[in-house]
């Protein structure tokens, strides 16, 4: 398997080099940056009617991870198979949840996961809000506390998640994650170190807590489980290393990196569930681990898929390449609520050896520039511009780059110049089509953002 993967075009791997953490940490936010002038109340920045655009609304309910023969479904089943057949035991039989609704509360998505009130992830520049109280989940961890309260001991949650982001071959405002959690009852920790939950302890910084035998045991089980899982998907000879990290809802926290195509790539975030979360879920004497992994990322690496937009295409030239890879008998593997799961269905492993995407689109890209002055620089955010471009031009935009940024001291104004690359995945775009798209974008730009065209 590893030998086959080594033949993958290095350009696929290089696309990930230097990407921002909002994508690399596919399930766990990393930023702890606070506004230097004090804490930001992001609820005051949320538009009264939300900030969810039509193009995002149209993606809700597509559930690509549940569509048989879709590469995301194949990756999901590969991981589920390993947890069901290799990592389940009498006490921990992993349950699968694939159909939780993406509309969740701010409490579920942020508060219960200990996100600080001024965490950048709460910003409407990063998150899609229906209102100040409800949003489109930014990670499948939004369902963690609910399932813990319902006494689920071992589970995987897969779903679509939503984040406002840049435009390029590996970023898309909708992508898919898998969250995994395993709970260890009190006999694993209290009997060992006799340390119940203590609200006075800073569990992020307290080294005595991190050195408890129960915490070390859970950490060991976490790393062993995830190493066996990733090797079952990518290859048994895979090199893996662990990097210390920070996430609001785990402590200690880690990132897994794999050595692939000559460089180390971060593939998932994980850690021991924060004791405060366990306490709030009525499990103060228990410990648990959790991880989050992005399905698109694995699929792009494994199947040599060069552009994240392809996962959303309806072109049969894409889908026919994965048809029949899953040879298992078709059974429903999704649950619409936490009261049911797919654990009763026995999964079969899927052989993905030699499955490589063959590009059918060789159409060249064409770029157009747009320059403007920022009329309200303090409230301008690049994600607002990217969102506007997506809404105006759809998936015909391959990527957008900021190519010039300067301040005119006499005018006391800042100018941005963005280069917009147009490219269809399934046909050749004419110059006339591109000119119309660019003209319409310029026509609407000043009315939608506080800018002045140059």
Swiss-Prot record:
Record carries keyword Repeat: no
CDD domains: PheRS_alpha_core
Binding site residues for substrate: 141-144, 163, 170-172, 177-179, 266, 291
Alphabetized UniProt keyword annotations: Aminoacyl-tRNA synthetase, ATP-binding, Ligase, Mitochondrion, Nucleotide-binding, Protein biosynthesis, Transit peptide
Keyword Repressor: no
GO biological process, one term: tRNA processing
Reaction it catalyzes: tRNA(Phe) + L-phenylalanine + ATP = L-phenylalanyl-tRNA(Phe) + AMP + diphosphate + H(+)
Domain (FDX-ACB) ranges: 361-454
Entries under SUPFAM superfamilies matching the protein: Anticodon-binding domain of PheRS, Class II aaRS and biotin synthetases
One Pfam entry name: FDX-ACB
InterPro entries: aa-tRNA-synth_II, aa-tRNA-synth_II/BPL/LPL, Fdx_antiC-bd, Fdx_antiC-bd_sf, Phenylalanyl-tRNA_Synthase
GO molecular function: ATP binding; phenylalanine-tRNA ligase activity; tRNA binding
Gene Ontology cellular component terms for the protein in this record: cytoplasm; mitochondrial matrix; mitochondrion
Subcellular location field: Mitochondrion matrix
PROSITE patterns the UniProt entry points to: AA_TRNA_LIGASE_II, FDX_ACB
SMART domains attached to this UniProt entry: FDX-ACB (SM00896)
Region ranges (Disordered): 327-347
Biased composition (Low complexity): 328-347
EC number(s) recorded for this UniProt protein: 6.1.1.20
Subunit: Monomer.
Family: Belongs to the class-II aminoacyl-tRNA synthetase family.
Task performed by this protein: Is responsible for the charging of tRNA(Phe) with phenylalanine in mitochondrial translation.
Protein known as: Phenylalanine--tRNA ligase, mitochondrial
